[in-house]
Amino acid sequence: QNTKTNTFNLNFFLNETCKDAMNIDDFIDSIQITIDDLKNLAKNGYVEGMSYLLIKNLKQLDVTKRPLHCSDLKRESIYIRDKNLWNKGDDKNTRLAKIATNITRLNTIALQGEYQNRYPHCLTDTKSKEHDEYGKIAYEAFGGKIHIDKANKKLFHNIMKYVIIDRNTIVYIIHSLLYIQS
């Protein structure tokens, strides 16, 4: 009975309370990568840089508008809003890997656009600080020294820690909504 109640509460939370949540593709499209984000990636590496970037952008959204919610950190159960539906992620985190790939693409575009525009000598002056930094950003954007699958596993865990749904919070929100409606 308790499992059914928890499942019901989770489904109610996702499908009713979070019915206006942003779709994951819209969330990714809304991310504006800054030069500071790129420098953070170079300084702190792929896992920390990407975690910071995603969490920074998730923080800008109300909890009920976020496109990601984790229901069980130990089992890495994540729900992703896609095409106005909540879908549970698979065991291989295929959808999260696609998200990471899209963010890597955005980092590359920002590196080749904003960074090169601000520091046009970064490709030609091999002795400049910006040339070195450009190389570090490009290296870290694709996972750095850690194998990309291992790096993504750490990245996903960091994101899941941030979007974990506390069962007490779900119950509180649901009861608040029911109280308001009555």
Predicted regions and their residues:
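Extended amphipathic coiled-coil helices
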Residues: 2-179
